[in-house]
């Protein structure tokens, strides 16, 4: 399959990730604990994967840092899904295409075109509407702040992966999941949560199983695609998560989604779409060489 198709599949799976997060929360793994359990399972499985392949665990420094930042973004995103409305969290995470465009222009030497200005303006305008509702006052809770930080970490990580040289997906998954676990441990420490938690120990085991069967495949698809697609292109393809995440959140959780939220969502999607209007950017890597 092509990188575009695999990135789209990853987006659909990311869009449904709130379901296991909320399910584990119901079992007693609140805050960052659900993400920590799943990422721990993904790390154990990816490390075993590398051992079986006997792959050298020495990726280029830039690729390793990029994978680690994606891991930070994964943990921030999982915590955001537990602390905020799924619809708002998913939409605010998708300021990532705007951050990606700025990073490409400032650090990767790609040109700034009129669609870039449209992407940035539409994304920021959409975020203001989603946060403020009536566009007169910004209201950002912990979930929204974590979602914004997650999108920024993702954008920087994707840019570093794209420009850091080719590395096997298994090795990158080790760095991504290990970083996600480390970030989750920081959250747990800040929250003063006992580790491992006494009551939901079985839930931790179930979370680790979900990490092996769900998170690891999605991470592998994501980091593999990130090395082959320009950051803004990848972020655009992953906006399929908006459709999946928002629709599933509205239909299954009955979360509020009024006219202002709909307009904000449309602006964010427009910002992502505008980046690919002039044509495919799969060959953007050539501009960096």
Where are these regions (language model features)?
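Loop-to-transmembrane-helix transition segments
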Residues: 2-10, 50-76, 120, 142-150, ...
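Helix-helix packing/entry segments at the starts of transmembrane helices
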Residues: 5, 37, 90-95, 161-179, ...
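Transmembrane alpha-helical segments that form core, pore/gating elements
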Residues: 7, 11-23, 46, 100-101, ...
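Hydrophobic/small/kink-forming positions within alpha-helical transmembrane segments
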Residues: 15, 19, 47, 67, ...
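Hydrophobic/aromatic residues within transmembrane alpha-helices
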Residues: 24, 34, 80, 92, ...
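Membrane-interface helix-cap regions at the ends of transmembrane helices
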Residues: 42-59, 72, 124-138, 179-205, ...
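C-terminal transmembrane-helix exit sites in multi-pass transporters
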Residues: 50-51, 79, 96-118, 243-262
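Hydrophobic transmembrane alpha-helices of multi-pass small-molecule transport proteins
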Residues: 115-133, 260-278
């Amino acid at each position: 399959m092509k990188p575009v198709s695999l990135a789209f599949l990853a987006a659909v799976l990311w869009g449904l990730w709130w379901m296991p997060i909320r399910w584990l929360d119901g079992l007693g793994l609140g805050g960052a604990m659900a993400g920590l359990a799943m990422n721990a399972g993904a790390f154990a499985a990816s490390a075993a994967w590398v051992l079986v392949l006997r792959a050298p665990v020495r990726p280029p420094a830039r690729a390793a840092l990029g994978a680690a930042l994606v891991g930070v973004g994964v943990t921030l995103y999982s915590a955001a899904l537990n602390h905020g409305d799924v619809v708002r969290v998913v939409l605010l995470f998708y300021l990532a295409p705007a951050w990606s465009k700025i990073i490409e222009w400032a650090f990767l030497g790609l040109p700034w075109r009129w669609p870039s200005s449209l992407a940035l303006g539409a994304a920021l305008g959409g975020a203001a509407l989603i946060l403020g509702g009536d566009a007169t006052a910004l209201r950002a809770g912990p979930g929204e702040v974590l979602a914004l930080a997650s999108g920024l970490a993702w954008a920087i990580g994707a840019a570093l992966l794209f420009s850091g040289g080719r590395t096997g997906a298994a090795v990158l998954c080790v760095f991504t999941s290990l970083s996600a676990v480390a970030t989750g441990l920081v959250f747990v420490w800040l929250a003063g949560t006992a580790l491992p938690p006494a009551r939901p120990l079985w839930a931790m085991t179930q979370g680790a199983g979900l990490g092996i069967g769900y998170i690891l495949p999605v991470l592998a698809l994501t980091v593999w695609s990130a090395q082959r697609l320009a950051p803004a292109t990848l972020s655009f393809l992953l906006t399929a998560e908006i459709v999946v995440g928002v629709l599933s959140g509205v239909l299954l959780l009955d979360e509020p989604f009024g006219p202002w939220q709909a307009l904000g969502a449309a602006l964010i999607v427009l910002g992502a779409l505008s980046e690919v209007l002039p044509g495919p950017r799969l060959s953007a890597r050539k501009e960096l060489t």
